[in-house]
């Protein structure tokens, strides 16, 4: 009787090992099929969409009032760091320095594919290429109403 129990136990263990090997082989085939599907060249639009969630939280606007030409480089540095810059040139009395700083700012904006918008005679908004400047806002601010729906 003990031989019968031992042989049944052996058969039971051997059967489980055989099943395990077959399962392992079958799962290996599934992996190959999945790899072929992944490498088929077809992909969904959802898989191709890359979204950086940190860009909007890192947005900063810097206000600069340069007094000398050497401070123009700091404006370009802010643009390189993808920060929008409001430049106030009203404090400059020397028109040559004002013109030189303005030319430097225009060059920096051009090289970095940014944009520049005139706010007033001597105040400008410089934006890197990840920031859009809406020129319609100037028209809204020029109107007496604070909100567009107040113009009734």
Swiss-Prot record:
The keyword Transferase does not apply. GO terms for cellular component: cytoplasm. Its main location: cytoplasm. InterPro entries: Cell_div_SepF (IPR023052), Cell_div_SepF/SepF-rel (IPR007561), SepF-like_sf (IPR038594). It comes from the Bacteria. It is found in: Cytoplasm. Pfam families: SepF. One of its GO terms (biological process) is FtsZ-dependent cytokinesis. Disulfide bonds: none annotated. Keywords: Cell cycle, Cell division, Cytoplasm, Septation. HAMAP family: SepF (MF_01197). PANTHER family: CELL DIVISION PROTEIN SEPF. Belongs to the SepF family. Cell division protein that is part of the divisome complex and is recruited early to the Z-ring. Probably stimulates Z-ring formation, perhaps through the cross-linking of FtsZ protofilaments. Its function overlaps with FtsA. Homodimer. Interacts with FtsZ. This is Cell division protein SepF. It comes from Clostridioides difficile (strain 630).
